[in-house]
Amino acid sequence: MANSLAIENVGEAQIITAEIWQSASSADIMLTMLLESRLFLTSSHHTPQLYLFAASCARRVNHLLQDPRSHEAIRAAELFATNASSSQHLLHSHLSARTAAFDLATTYNSHPLISTDQPNDDDHRSIPQVTLLGGALIHAAATASMACCPSEILNPLRAAETSARYAIKALYYEQLTNDTDSTLISQLLEEEQHRQSQALRIFLGNPFDSKRWPPFTITNNADIDNRVTACTTQQ
């Protein structure tokens, strides 16, 4: 009797978790769910889809990427996800893109330090515009670098989570650079979080109920291009 109740409780918890995943409007919530799932964190089953998700986040800040090495990193992640390139190429692209991000950091090093936390809305106007721009460009470059981070350096799930977080920060600093109204900034970031949540569902399906919502099956580059385009242009 006790065993049957335990099984029933586990089943109910699984259903609730799957429903939370399907309805979540924030990628933060969904990625936290995955990070807290020990089984998922140690599994390589969704690795290709995680690279595609990270690449889609990086493409959202494509307009802020100034170095060809950053653009190459995004494509390297997409190619690796389809077994169209080697792990050595992925590593080389990551290291090159990371160097590009470091180069940007060096360029803006003479300006006031850029905090990894989002500045207070009342404080950002006292920060030089060039510093805010540097924050946008550096976080965008870091997004691209993390999108193709090899698993031997960082777990693909953690790398994807970092890419998503850096992309949000890049867009945030971009809006501060443009002196956008704080209310509008909050709205834009909420929309970006929702867009990322949709991208996770597109690529990963529902890891907590994969029979009903299986992950995206990668067949060719055209499929990838279509999915990535959908993730980067959806409203």
Predicted regions and their residues:
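Structured binding/interaction patches within domain cores
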Residues: 1-235
